[in-house]
C-alpha cells in the first residue's frame, strides 16, 4: 500500500511540474527532454581552487546534478567523453550595459541653462533616478550575446549607464535558446551610482565632481528624512532609493582618486560600495586597501605610444609612459595586498580583447587562480548569487566552458560555452588540429606549407623554394580552403580533413581554370616551444613613485631633526631679522632659535650666507584642484573643495620650488555663494587627505561683481543679473539660514540641508568668508549685510579698490588679500593701482599678497617685493604679506607663518635675500620633512631623462614586435582661475 501511495504521489508531482509550463505550444506534440548529460574524463574546475582530474560533470534541466571523480551516471544519459579537455565555470561580467539602449541626449541648449527638474513626483534633480529599472529597458541582443559567449561569458549584470543615481540592474544568462522568463536570473540585481550627469537631462546642477558628491550626500540625507515619514508629498525617487538599500550598491568611480571619494561617501552613509575602478589603483595601494571595498577592474590596458618620431615623443608625459608600463601589474598588486576584485569588459572595445589582456595580466604576475576567481566566484559572491552562478557545485546553473586546455594559455581553444544547460559551439571540438609543416603537391608542382595560429583559426604560409607566396586559409566544419598566388597566378583548393591521418587531400582549381587534385603531407607537428619561451620572459616594470609622475619621490618624505647653522633668519615676528642665527628642528616643530646651538643627533645644514624664512602662504589659489566652480546654482555652499584636491598636480612641486608651503584652495567665482575651501600643506607625494590641514579652520568662498552676475556668460536666466541682485541673494540666503536654525533648535523634525548648515556656521562665526571682490560699492555692501546679520567678513580677496574703503575695512575688522600690480584685465578693475596693499596696510588692515595663479604663486616672494617699490613698505613688512599675514587671515598663525619656537617647522632656505629676483629656494621643509631640495631636483631631472629613454626604448620594441600603438597626444594641463568652468 505504501509503495502504491508513493508511486501515486510521484505521478501527481510529475504531472503538476509538467503543468507549470503554462504557455501553449502550437509546434506539435508537447514534450520535454529531461535526460541527464554526463561529461566524462575532463579536468574540471569546480571552483578556481577546487579542481579534479579525469572527473565527470552531470547536468540535467540546466543545473549541475553532481560533479567529481565518483559520479554515478544514470541509465539513458547522454555521455560525452572529454578526455584531454578541461571544463571551467562560464565567466560573469558584473558591470555591463548588455541589452540596455543608451538614453538619447536631451535636445535644446543655447544661451539659457535649465536650472529646475523636468519631472514631477520625483527627486528635485533629474540626475537622481533610483526608480529606473534596467529590466524595463531590456531587450535581448542575440548578436552581442554571441560575442560575449565567444569570449567565455555566461552571465552579465546589466544596467542603465546614465546619471548619478541610475537605478537597478538585471542579471541575465546569455541563453539564446530560451526567453526572458528563463534567462532573467534577477530583475533587480544591484543598485548603481556614478559621479556623471545624465545625458537625458539639461538640468545644470551639478556641473562638477564636487557638486555630484554633494548631491549624493544630500540625496542620502533626504532619503532618511523621507523614510521617517516627515514629508507629506510623494517622491518616487526617494521611495525607490530606500527600497533598494538591501541590494549590492555599485558605483562607477573611474580612477584611484574617485575610488577613495566614493568610499568616503559610502562610509558617511553606512554603505559599503562595490566600486568600478580605473586600473591605476596600484599607485595608491595602501589607501585602496584601507577602503575595504570590493573593486571592479576594467582590463583596458593602454597601448604603447608610437614614439618613432622623436619630436612627437616629447608630447608623451612620463606619467603616461609609466602607466603603459605599470598598468598590467595592477591586478597582481591588488591581489597580493588582499583587495577583492572582479574583472569587467567595461572599457574594452571588443570582448575578443579580453583573453589577450588577461594573458598580459598573468604575464605581469597575476596568478591564474586569482584571474579565474575575478571572472567567476567573486562576481557571483559580490552579487549575492554564489548559490546559483560562478561555480560548478551541485545545484548551480550548468554554465560552463569546454576548452582544449588551460583557458589562459594562448594556444588554448574554447570549444563550447554551455549556458543554463544549452550548448553553444564556439569551435568544433571534434575538428582536427591541422597545424604543422607540410609538403604540398598542387597538381604537378610542389610547395612548402606551414600552418600556425590557433586550432580554430589557423594561418597559412606557402613557400616556393625560399619565396613566400601570398596565401589565405579558412578551416571550418572539417573543410579546409586554401588559396595562394604564384607569379600573379591564383591556386585554389578545398579538402575534407578526415580522422587522424597526417594527409589532407582534395580538389584543386588551377590558374588556367582546369581542375586537378592536391595533397598535403605533414612533415612536422606544430609546437609552441619557442613562443612559450618568449611568453615566459618577465616584463621589466619601472618603480612607482609618490606621486607616480615626474619629480615624484621613491618614498614619501619623512620628518627628521635638523639644525640650520649661521643663517640670516627672517622671523616674521617682532624679533625681525636675525643675523648668524641657528634654528633647531625637532619632531617636526621649531625647537630652538639662537646662536651656537648644539645639534645632538640632528642633521646639520650649513646656512652661512643664506636666508631662512617661514614657508610662503598663498591665501588665494586654485592649483591642486580637479574642479574649481560648481556653477549649477547661485549658491553652492554645500560643495567642498576638499573633495576635489588633486595631490598629483605638478604645480605643487613647482610651488615648493618657489618656497610655498601652505595655501587656501578656493572655489571659483561662478556664484555669489560658492563652495567651502580647503587649506592645504603642499606635502608632495602624500594623499589628498594628508595634505589637508588637521583641524582646519572652516572657510567658504563668496564672490561679487561681473562673474557672479554672468556679465560675460551669454546667459540671462539665472538670478542675479545685476549687482543689486547680488545683495539680495545674500539677504535671502542668510534669512533662510536663520529660519533653518530656529527650526533646528526647536526640537521639531527638520530636513538636514548641507547648504543651510554651512550658512548657519557663518552666522555663528564658525566659518569664515573669503570674498572675491573688486568694486568699492559692493565691498561696502557685503560688510553691511554682515553687520545686519551679526557676523564679520574675514577676507576680501583681490580687493583692488580696497584703497578706497580701507578705513571702513579696518573698522569692520576684515583683512585684504590682494594682487601686487594687476590691473586692466577686465572692466571692473579699471581703478586698480599698485599702491593698494601699502594704503590698506597704512589704515590698519591685515594685508596679504596672493596669486590666484599657479605660475605667479611660485614667485610670491617677488610679488611681495613690489610693495616696497609701490608704497615704500619695509622689507620685513613686505615679507609678512606672504607669511604671517596670510596665516592670520586663514587663522593658522598659531601653527605657521613665522619662525617661532613651538610652531610647525615649515621653513625655506634661500640662496639670497628672499625678496630678491635672484633668490632661489634651496630647501623647502614642511613639519621637518624636506619636500624640495635643489640638489635632489638636479638629480631628478637627469633621472627623468634616463627613465624616459628607457621607456621609449621599450615602446619602440613593442611596436617592432607587432604590438598595437597609439598616437602621441599633446595633453595641455588646464590652469584654473576664478572664472574657470
Model-derived regions: residue spans:
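Polyanionic/metal-chelating signatures
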Residues: 140-282, 413, 419, 454, ...
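Active-site core of metal-dependent hydrolases
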Residues: 54, 159, 232-327, 341-342, ...
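His/Asp/Glu-enriched, well-ordered alpha-helical/loop segment
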Residues: 103, 110-123, 131, 298-308, ...
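Tryptophan-anchored aromatic micro-motifs
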Residues: 39-42, 429-448, 456-466, 471-473, ...
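Acidic, glycine-enriched loop/beta-strand segments at the rims
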Residues: 25-31, 44-56, 68-69, 352, ...
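Beta-sheet ligand-binding and adhesion/scaffold domains
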Residues: 95, 441-448, 479-548
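Histidine-rich, glycine-flanked metal-binding segment
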Residues: 21-31, 35, 44, 48-90, ...
Amino acid at each position: 500500500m505504501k509503495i502504491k501511495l508513493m508511486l501515486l504521489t510521484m505521478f501527481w508531482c510529475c504531472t503538476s511540474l509538467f503543468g507549470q509550463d503554462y504557455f501553449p505550444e502550437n509546434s506539435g506534440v508537447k514534450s520535454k527532454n529531461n535526460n541527464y548529460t554526463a561529461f566524462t574524463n575532463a579536468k574540471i574546475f569546480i571552483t578556481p581552487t577546487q579542481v579534479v582530474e579525469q572527473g565527470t560533470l552531470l547536468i540535467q534541466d540546466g543545473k549541475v546534478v553532481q560533479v567529481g571523480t565518483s559520479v554515478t551516471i544514470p541509465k539513458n544519459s547522454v555521455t560525452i567523453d572529454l578526455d584531454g579537455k578541461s571544463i571551467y565555470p562560464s565567466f560573469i561580467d558584473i558591470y555591463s550595459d548588455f541589452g540596455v539602449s543608451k538614453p538619447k541626449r536631451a535636445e535644446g541648449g543655447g544661451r539659457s541653462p535649465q536650472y529646475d527638474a523636468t519631472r514631477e513626483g520625483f527627486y528635485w534633480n533629474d540626475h537622481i533616478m533610483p526608480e529606473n529599472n534596467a529590466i524595463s529597458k531590456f531587450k535581448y541582443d542575440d548578436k552581442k550575446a554571441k560575442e560575449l559567449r565567444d569570449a567565455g561569458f555566461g552571465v552579465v549584470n546589466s544596467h542603465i549607464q546614465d546619471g548619478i543615481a541610475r537605478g537597478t540592474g538585471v542579471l541575465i544568462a546569455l541563453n539564446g535558446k530560451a526567453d526572458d522568463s528563463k534567462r532573467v536570473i534577477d530583475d533587480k540585481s544591484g543598485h548603481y551610482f556614478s559621479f556623471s550627469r545624465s545625458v537625458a537631462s539639461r538640468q545644470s546642477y551639478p556641473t562638477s565632481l564636487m557638486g555630484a558628491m554633494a548631491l549624493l550626500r544630500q540625496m542620502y540625507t533626504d532619503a532618511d528624512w523621507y523614510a521617517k515619514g516627515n514629508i507629506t508629498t510623494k517622491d518616487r525617487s526617494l521611495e525607490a532609493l530606500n527600497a533598494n538599500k538591501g541590494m549590492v550598491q555599485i558605483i562607477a568611480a573611474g580612477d584611484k582618486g574617485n575610488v577613495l571619494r566614493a568610499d568616503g561617501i559610502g562610509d558617511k552613509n553606512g554603505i559599503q560600495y562595490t566600486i568600478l575602478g580605473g586600473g591605476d589603483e596600484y599607485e595608491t595601494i595602501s589607501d585602496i586597501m584601507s577602503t575595504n571595498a570590493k573593486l571592479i577592474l576594467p582590463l583596458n590596458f593602454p597601448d604603447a605610444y608610437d614614439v618613432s618620431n622623436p619630436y612627437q615623443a616629447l608630447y608623451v608625459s612620463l606619467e603616461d609612459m609609466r602607466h603603459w608600463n605599470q598598468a598590467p601589474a595592477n591586478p597582481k598588486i591588488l591581489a597580493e595586498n588582499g583587495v577583492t576584485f572582479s574583472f569587467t569588459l567595461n572599457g574594452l572595445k571588443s570582448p575578443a580583447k579580453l583573453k589577450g589582456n588577461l594573458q598580459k595580466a598573468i604575464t605581469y604576475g597575476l596568478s591564474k587562480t586569482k584571474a579565474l576567481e575575478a571572472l567567476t566566484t567573486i562576481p557571483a559572491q559580490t552579487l549575492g548569487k554564489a548559490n546559483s552562478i560562478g561555480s560548478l557545485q551541485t545545484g548551480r546553473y550548468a554554465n560552463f566552458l569546454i576548452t582544449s586546455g588551460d583557458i589562459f594559455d594562448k594556444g588554448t581553444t574554447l570549444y563550447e560555452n554551455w549556458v543554463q544547460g544549452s550548448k553553444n559551439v564556439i569551435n568544433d571540438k571534434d575538428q582536427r588540429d591541422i597545424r604543422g609543416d607540410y609538403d604540398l603537391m598542387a597538381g604537378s608542382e610542389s610547395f612548402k606549407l606551414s600552418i600556425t595560429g590557433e586550432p580554430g583559426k589557423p594561418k597559412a604560409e606557402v613557400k616556393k623554394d625560399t619565396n613566400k607566396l601570398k596565401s589565405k586559409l579558412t578551416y571550418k566544419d572539417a573543410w579546409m580552403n586554401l588559396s595562394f598566388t604564384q607569379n600573379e597566378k591564383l591556386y585554389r583548393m578545398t579538402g575534407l580533413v578526415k580522422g587522424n591521418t597526417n594527409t589532407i587531400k582534395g580538389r584543386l582549381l588551377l590558374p588556367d581554370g582546369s581542375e586537378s587534385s592536391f595533397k598535403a603531407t605533414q612533415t612536422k607537428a606544430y609546437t609552441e616551444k619557442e613562443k612559450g619561451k618568449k611568453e615566459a620572459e618577465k616584463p621589466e616594470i619601472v618603480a612607482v613613485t609618490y606621486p607616480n609622475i615626474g619629480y615624484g619621490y621613491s618614498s614619501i618624505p619623512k620628518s627628521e631633526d635638523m639644525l640650520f647653522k649661521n643663517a640670516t633668519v627672517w622671523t616674521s615676528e617682532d624679533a625681525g631679522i636675525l643675523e648668524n642665527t641657528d634654528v633647531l628642528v625637532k619632531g617636526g616643530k621649531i625647537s630652538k632659535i639662537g646662536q651656537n646651538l648644539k645639534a645632538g643627533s640632528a642633521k646639520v645644514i650649513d646656512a652661512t650666507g643664506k636666508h631662512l624664512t617661514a614657508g610662503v602662504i598663498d591665501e588665494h589659489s586654485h592649483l591642486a584642484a580637479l574642479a574649481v566652480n560648481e556653477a549649477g546654482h547661485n549658491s553652492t555652499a554645500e560643495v567642498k573643495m576638499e573633495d576635489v584636491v588633486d595631490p598629483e598636480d605638478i604645480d605643487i612641486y613647482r610651488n615648493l620650488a618657489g618656497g610655498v608651503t601652505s595655501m587656501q584652495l578656493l572655489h571659483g567665482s561662478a556664484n555669489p555663494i560658492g563652495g567651502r575651501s580647503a587649506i592645504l600643506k603642499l606635502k608632495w607625494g602624500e594623499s589628498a587627505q594628508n595634505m589637508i590641514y588637521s583641524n582646519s579652520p572652516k572657510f567658504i568662498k563668496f564672490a561679487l561683481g561681473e562673474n557672479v552676475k554672468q556679465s560675460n556668460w551669454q546667459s540671462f536666466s539665472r538670478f542675479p543679473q545685476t549687482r543689486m541682485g547680488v545683495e539680495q541673494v545674500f539677504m535671502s540666503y542668510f534669512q533662510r539660514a536663520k529660519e533653518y536654525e530656529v527650526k533646528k533648535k526647536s526640537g521639531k523634525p527638520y530636513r538636514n540641508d548641507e547648504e543651510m548648515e554651512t550658512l548657519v556656521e557663518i552666522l555663528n562665526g564658525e566659518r569664515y568668508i573669503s570674498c572675491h571682490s573688486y568694486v568699492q560699492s559692493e565691498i561696502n555692501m557685503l560688510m553691511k549685510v554682515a553687520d545686519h546679520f551679526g557676523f564679520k567678513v574675514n577676507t576680501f580677496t583681490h580687493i583692488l579698490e580696497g584703497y578706497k574703503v580701507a578705513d571702513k575695512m579696518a573698522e569692520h575688522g576684515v583683512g585684504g588679500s590682494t594682487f601686487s600690480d594687476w590691473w586692466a584685465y577686465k572692466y571692473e578693475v579699471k581703478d586698480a593701482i599698485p599702491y593698494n596693499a601699502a594704503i590698506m596696510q597704512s589704515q590698519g588692515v591685515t594685508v596679504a599678497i596672493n596669486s590666484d595663479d599657479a605660475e605667479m604663486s611660485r614667485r610670491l616672494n617677488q610679488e611681495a617685493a613690489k610693495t616696497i617699490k609701490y608704497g615704500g613698505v619695509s622689507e620685513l613688512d613686505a615679507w609678512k604679506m606672504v607669511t604671517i599675514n596670510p596665516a592670520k587671515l586663514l587663522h593658522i598663525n598659531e601653527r605657521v607663518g613665522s619662525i617661532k619656537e613651538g610652531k610647525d617647522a615649515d621653513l625655506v632656505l634661500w640662496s639670497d635675500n628672499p625678496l630678491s629676483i635672484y633668490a632661489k629656494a634651496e630647501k623647502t621643509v614642511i613639519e621637518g620633512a624636506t619636500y624640495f631640495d635643489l640638489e635632489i631636483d638636479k638629480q631628478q631631472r637627469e633621472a627623468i631623462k634616463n627613465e624616459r629613454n628607457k621607456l621609449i626604448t621599450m615602446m619602440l620594441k613593442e611596436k617592432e614586435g607587432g604590438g598595437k600603438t597609439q598616437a602621441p597626444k599633446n595633453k595641455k594641463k588646464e590652469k584654473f582661475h576664478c572664472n574657470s568652468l
